[in-house]
């Protein structure tokens, strides 16, 4: 009997996780299948307990369920997920325990390392102050980066930075509004966009243009649809190094795969599968 895995969210029909994980299971000869399940916040508790009762191998969670899942009494988050305040991966233990993890931060970290970014001491500008920004900023602060969180609503950026500072991590962090972005980027090593600006169908939107970027910068956009966002095009024009959101998607998925199975996933195949799905 096949072991079932899946992603819960609403909406969830657009998810590339089923294609990515099913390709990995097939390549490794594992008798497993991964589905997308539409689950609304009010049904989340029943859905998780139902999945555990039916013997699911594990679950991914996406918008709008990550924060709500952390608050469920029976979900036991690891320290990083607890700090971030959200879980995106659930692992069902043999004794009925349900462990919660957040693989978004590790996924972003691996994407940066793969591109040759030295995280410790790097001056990083993180655009956005939502759930993705929290996951990325907590991870990078834990790894010793010097971070400035920028957001249209300055209070949110300042609040997030204050919260991360209170965790007493090796990195430095501050928050600000958008007004000083040009000056910040002049001295920055990395710009990470964690907002939805530029995501399909609003593909002409961008947080900055080529004039505000420079060739010494690495620009990382976590948006992966379209494959090359306007921000990444602007970065390429300026001579900056670019990182596609596909890498973070694949690496966070690969980390979930390891947590569920204890098996090393076929990363190149997962990446190829996602790229083919986006180009279809």
UniProtKB/Swiss-Prot annotation:
The protein's name in its UniProt record: Shikimate dehydrogenase (NADP(+))
GO BP terms, alphabetized: amino acid biosynthetic process; aromatic amino acid family biosynthetic process; chorismate biosynthetic process; shikimate metabolic process
Annotated EC = 1.1.1.25
> Subunit structure, per the record?
Homodimer.
The biological pathway it contributes to is:
Metabolic intermediate biosynthesis; chorismate biosynthesis; chorismate from D-erythrose 4-phosphate and phosphoenolpyruvate: step 4/7
Which species? Methanosarcina mazei (strain ATCC BAA-159 / DSM 3647 / Goe1 / Go1 / JCM 11833 / OCM 88)
Keyword Amino-acid biosynthesis recorded: yes
Keywords noted in UniProt: Amino-acid biosynthesis, Aromatic amino acid biosynthesis, NADP, Oxidoreductase
Q: Which residues form each disulfide bond in the chain? A: none
This molecule's function is given as: Involved in the biosynthesis of the chorismate, which leads to the biosynthesis of aromatic amino acids. Catalyzes the reversible NADPH linked reduction of 3-dehydroshikimate (DHSA) to yield shikimate (SA).
Q: Which Gene3D superfamilies match?
A: Leucine Dehydrogenase, chain A, domain 1, NAD(P)-binding Rossmann-like Domain
What GO MF annotations does this protein's record show?
A: NADP binding; shikimate 3-dehydrogenase (NADP+) activity
Q: Which reaction does it catalyse?
A: shikimate + NADP(+) = 3-dehydroshikimate + NADPH + H(+)
Transmembrane spans: none
Q: Where does NADP(+) bind?
A: 128-132, 151-156, 222, 245
Where does the chain bind shikimate?
15-17, 62, 88, 104, 224
Identify its protein family: Belongs to the shikimate dehydrogenase family.
Active site: residue positions: 66 (proton acceptor)
């Amino acid at each position: 009997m096949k072991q079932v895995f899946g992603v819960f969210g609403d909406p969830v029909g657009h998810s590339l996780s089923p294609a990515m994980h099913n390709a990995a299971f097939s390549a490794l000869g594992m008798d497993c299948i991964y589905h997308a399940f539409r689950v609304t916040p009010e049904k989340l508790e029943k859905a998780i307990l139902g999945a555990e009762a039916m013997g699911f191998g594990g679950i991914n969670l996406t918008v709008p369920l990550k924060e709500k899942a952390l608050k469920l009494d029976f979900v036991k988050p690891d320290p990083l997920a607890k700090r971030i305040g959200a879980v995106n991966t659930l692992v069902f233990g043999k004794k009925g325990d349900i462990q919660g993890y957040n693989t978004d931060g590790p996924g972003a970290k691996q994407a940066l390392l793969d591109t040759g970014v030295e995280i410790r001491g790097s001056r990083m500008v993180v655009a956005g102050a939502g759930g993705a920004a929290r996951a990325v900023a907590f991870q990078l602060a834990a790894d010793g980066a010097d971070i400035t969180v920028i957001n249209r609503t300055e209070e949110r950026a300042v609040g997030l930075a204050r919260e991360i500072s209170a965790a007493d991590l090796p990195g430095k962090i501050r928050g600000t509004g958008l007004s000083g972005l040009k000056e910040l980027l002049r001295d920055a090593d990395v710009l990470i966009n964690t907002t939805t600006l530029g995501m399909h169908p609003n593909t002409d939107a961008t947080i900055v243009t080529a004039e505000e970027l420079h060739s010494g910068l690495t620009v990382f956009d976590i948006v992966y649809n379209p494959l090359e966002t306007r921000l990444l095009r602007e970065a390429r024009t300026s001579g900056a190094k670019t990182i596609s959101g596909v890498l973070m998607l694949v690496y966070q998925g690969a980390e979930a795969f390891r947590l569920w199975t204890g098996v090393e996933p076929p990363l190149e195949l997962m990446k190829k599968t996602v790229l083919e799905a986006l180009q279809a």
